[in-house]
Curated annotation (Swiss-Prot):
Entries under NCBIfam families matching the protein: F_box_assoc_1 (TIGR01640)
Classification via Pfam families: F-box (PF00646), FBA_1 (PF07734)
Official protein name in the record: Putative F-box protein At3g23260
Residue ranges constituting the F-box domain according to the UniProt record: 1-46
Amino acid sequence: MEWRSLPVELQEEILSRVPAKYLARLRSTSKQWNALSKTGSFAKKHSANATKEPLIIMLKDSRVYLASVNLHGVHNNVAQSFELGSRLYLKDPHISNVFHCDGLLLLCSIKENTLEVWNPCSGEAKLIKPRHSYYKESDFYALGYDNKSSCKKYKVLRVISQVHVQGDFKIEYEIYDFTNDSWRVHGATTELSIRQKHPVSVKGSTYWVVRNRYFPYKYFLSFDFSTERFQSLSLPQPFPYLVTDLSVVREEQLCLFGYYNWSTTSEDLNVWVTTSLGSVVSWSKFLTIQIIKPRVDMFDYGMSFLVDEQNKSLVCWISQKVLHIVGEIYHIQDLDDHGRDSALRSSCSVLMNYVPSLAQIQ
């Protein structure tokens, strides 16, 4: 029996279970399937039924690449290796930051003064014009959605850092709403210091580790795109770490990275995983290992990391180097392109899991 002779409802049910990265190839074989994959009802069914198969995305030298981690032999004391694949985004060669939410990528290019939301799976894209004439390198961005609505309403958060003539420091917030294609000023504060250029997203909300400007400690901050409010959450206590970062596991849990205890100058690297994530957050220790080689100043340009719970491994991307940890064994892999123009170096290091989807940009 041919596919075309099957009832349309059955075709839709079967296609809704095909992983997004393979479905993208099938669309080119049938106009009917291509049209079906672009409907909102199918995208919703596909999100519920299809197996999630994450890919790894890396921002290196202002370019976005697919990447992979070779785990073959790690249980026989053979070091895992990191392999850079093909470029994922070819339109703009000067990407300064990239953010992932629900299968959509938010791409920022300060050199070209562009902010774009793109679905690599469907090819759908949307350029977002700034409220004023330009975006700034000191800006922070996040993409999320209203998870209390029957249909996901995507929004972009822009965090603007300003230093006034008198030396006063202020952070302003703007929100871009896709439904009316416009920015609006959301609020301002003089208390926060957000230095993590690459926040993470879980179920539509965004998370950072931030510092209060008036106290020497860090805390956990979330932004709920449904209520459009920030909320302070708890970190594991005590948390006296100089280098911190967040990552996402299985699209539902957060991993927290802490390195270099400033109160004891200990070089222990610690990773925690959330056991509950909501208005109350609980953490469980995943990994502790003493790292000798990385210097603290290696983290000046930021870092990103991924955790593989099944293989008890961690991959950390820092200043053109990849730190691999499997159990209690670690090594450092150099990905530096010697002789390459340093002007192409990204202002931040981004390494993240990307789960393809048919999410539609609204």
